[in-house]
């Protein structure tokens, strides 16, 4: 019998599709998870900074205008903790607004500091049961008497000096933690630039080939995702600005520094807020990469939710009042609100009762994000995953069902 690396079937699937726990349908198609994690039902609504997010305690409706529209929930979290990065499809199939509490998220654990470099295999920690003892890094034990003094006339050899790792406060016998190239102390990026994002595709021969996503996977946007992210915010490899409509690149709103762990400050791009950053974005499933970058790379999302309504209103989302840092909730941005002067975006939060025009009755629905053709598996090896833009791309378009 031929062996396969396919993981066991994952619970979940698209909401309203077979296999979802709320539908009672047949088992969903098995989903391949590179990290071996199984999806859990959760939605990051409040952006909790202690646990990485909690399920909502109340149901928040999208409104009747969202009926029949697929949405892609992308949750971004700060760097430095094992935090769930959620992606979920939220199709609303009836005229009644469906709550976000019923959405299913595909959860992947975001590794903290000390990411493995590209090509380094993952090593499973050995069990403490039945393992041979670790050799004493301080040399052979010296014979002692009952007073714990060396016995007279017995030599056990000179004691070697302590290893270099021990002299710097590291546990003797432990290997130093391997950090990805380009990461500074505590696993943060050594500079304001982001490391390259590798989107990998298995060719069936045990090797993985790095490929950019196709146009179909990014909604027609032709930006090369790995190159654009590797070049840093708002820069392409040839140092030209990215097509961010009507925006000026600004640092990510977050704790003291971009990429610092929760409650700490450190190297990286400076930020404006003293609280940790957690941006939860609800995008349409067919949103282009340019729309995502225009929202996330400008650093306008501080805390809470932002919703890109149907139409082009979301393209000018960065000029709205999102950076006010309002408490958790869904921010529905109307076209009129999205065109406000950037100078007033910190004064008042947007209204949460927007009702944009409903989608056309005969308009085709976008494909399920989990089944986008051309989407590749994601192996978090050299991507810092501390940037909302990186998380949006990796959780949004590098996930596929097989």
Swiss-Prot record:
Residues 345-355 have a biased composition (Low complexity). Transmembrane segments: none annotated. Residues 1-29, 109-255, 337-371 are annotated as: Disordered. It comes from the Eukaryota. Residues 356-367 have a biased composition (Pro residues). This is Proline-rich protein 25.
């Amino acid at each position: 019998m031929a062996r396969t690396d396919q993981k066991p079937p994952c619970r979940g699937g698209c909401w309203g599709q077979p296999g979802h726990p709320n539908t009672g349908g047949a088992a969903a198609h098995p989903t391949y998870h590179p990290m071996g994690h199984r999806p859990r039902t959760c939605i990051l609504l409040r952006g909790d900074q202690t646990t990485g997010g909690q399920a909502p305690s109340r149901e928040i409706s999208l409104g009747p205008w969202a009926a029949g529209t697929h949405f892609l929930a992308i949750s971004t979290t700060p760097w430095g903790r094992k935090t769930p990065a959620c992606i979920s499809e939220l199709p609303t199939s009836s005229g009644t607004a469906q709550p976000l509490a019923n959405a299913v998220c595909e959860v992947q654990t975001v590794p903290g500091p000390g990411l493995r470099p590209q090509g380094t295999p993952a090593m499973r920690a050995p069990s403490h049961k039945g393992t041979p003892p670790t050799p004493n890094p301080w040399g052979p034990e010296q014979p002692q008497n009952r007073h714990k003094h060396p016995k007279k006339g017995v030599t056990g050899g000179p004691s070697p000096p302590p290893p270099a790792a021990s002299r710097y406060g590291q546990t003797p016998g432990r290997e130093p933690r391997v950090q990805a190239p380009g990461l500074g102390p505590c696993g943060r990026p050594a500079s304001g630039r982001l490391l390259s994002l590798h989107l990998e595709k298995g060719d069936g021969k045990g090797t993985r080939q790095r490929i950019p996503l196709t146009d179909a996977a990014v909604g027609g946007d032709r930006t090369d995702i790995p190159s654009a992210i590797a070049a840093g915010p708002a820069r392409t490899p040839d140092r030209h600005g990215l097509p961010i409509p009507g925006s000026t690149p600004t640092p990510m709103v977050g704790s003291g520094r971009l990429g610092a762990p929760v409650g700490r400050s450190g190297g990286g791009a400076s930020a404006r807020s003293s609280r940790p950053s957690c941006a939860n974005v609800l995008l349409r499933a067919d949103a282009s990469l340019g729309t995502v970058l225009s929202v996330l790379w400008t650093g306008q999302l501080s805390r809470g939710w932002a919703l890109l309504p149907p139409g082009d209103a979301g393209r000018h989302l960065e000029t709205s009042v999102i950076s006010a840092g309002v408490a958790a909730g869904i921010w529905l941005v109307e076209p009129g609100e999205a065109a406000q002067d950037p100078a007033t975006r910190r004064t008042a939060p947007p209204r949460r009762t927007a009702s944009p025009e409903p989608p056309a009755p005969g308009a085709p629905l976008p494909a399920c994000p989990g089944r986008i053709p051309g989407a590749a598996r994601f192996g978090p090896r050299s991507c810092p995953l501390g940037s909302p833009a990186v998380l949006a791309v990796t959780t949004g378009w590098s996930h596929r069902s097989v």
